[in-house]
Amino acid sequence: IMIRSSIYITLLTLGNGLLGFAIQMLLAKNFGVGVEIDTYLFSLSIPIFVAAIISSIMNYTSVPVIAKIKNDPDRFEKYINSLILFVTLLAIFILVMIGYLAEAQQLLIDYSYVDNNIGEIIKIAWIVCALQIFQGALISIFNGMQRHKYAIILVSFQSIGVILILIFSYQFVSVILVLFGMMLGLFFSIVLGVYIINR
């Protein structure tokens, strides 16, 4: 069983790698090298960095605890509820402060040569950040429960959302649409993750 699970997880990981490669190819095809791809990369730079740090901290601190208490229903439920409450409040804080975060990011990085709508694009990128943090908590829960395949599946949803947008909106594709694809994928991954945990 362990060998079969390891093979399954390896295949899912490779699949995620292929999805990432497909996204890079589609972005290059749709945007090439220029202002739009610079806007996409710059708008995501800080929000993705923040989400990655917070998710890594959650994974490092939560996984050992969850692994230890997963067979104790009361403690497990109490801890999971506390973790979900924490990331929900953090996501709400980011959404409330989104205007200030976008302004601060524009002060840190020179956006003078990218899209004129960069302010709005950065705000959307911070929404992506909030969703990624919530997803990161769910991934930590699955890793702690040693249900790694679900963690990997959740990660793939963001890539799938972007790919679908790039494929079906190729004539009208824009940075905002790509970010919308990320948000859509993250949203459905969160819904699926919460459903699996609560079933």
Language-model regions, residue ranges each:
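Signature of the first transmembrane helix
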Residues: 4-62, 163
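Short membrane-interface helical motifs at transmembrane helix boundaries
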Residues: 93-114
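Interfacial transmembrane-helix starts/ends
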Residues: 3-6, 41, 62, 73-89, ...
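Transmembrane-helix boundary and interhelical linker motifs in polytopic inner-membrane proteins
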Residues: 28, 54-85, 144-149
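Helix-loop interface residues and adjacent transmembrane-helix termini in multi-pass membrane transporters
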Residues: 34, 144-145, 172
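Alpha-helical transmembrane segments of multi-pass membrane proteins
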Residues: 112-138, 164
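Alpha-helical transmembrane segments of multi-pass membrane transporters/permeases
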Residues: 7-12, 127, 141-167
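Hydrophobic alpha-helical transmembrane segments
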Residues: 153-167, 172-199
